[in-house]
């Protein structure tokens, strides 16, 4: 499968910021892990990170025009209020899994609501970098069920 992995604001700072919540692995190490695991499973993985909402939307639309089979998105804080990203996910009709490194449901109240998850086929949270691999497996299972 051709899978796009999109990471939103501040995820480039993982390994630097709030290590007790997000872990000590660098963003670069997590990206390498995702690529390696995807390759082992026979997938073509494209990674993208931006701190800008419009760039994330552009990348989602690019996934449509470049015929991606699945998307994994960690919208970061946009999770809680970006109806524009929600609409972009809905508009492209590509199976998408939302991922969060931490368990957002065990944190502050404002983090418990996701406006982007309803546009996705599911959500993985609280599994650290393994959440991305679980999302790959979810996309595989979804494809097999079609």
Swiss-Prot record:
One of its GO terms (molecular function) is 3-dehydroquinate dehydratase activity. Substrate binds at residues 74, 80, 87, 101-102, 111. Keywords: Amino-acid biosynthesis, Aromatic amino acid biosynthesis, Lyase. The keyword Amino-acid biosynthesis applies. Pfam families: DHquinase_II (PF01220). It catalyses: 3-dehydroquinate = 3-dehydroshikimate + H2O. The record marks 17 as: Transition state stabilizer. Belongs to the type-II 3-dehydroquinase family. Homododecamer. This is 3-dehydroquinate dehydratase.
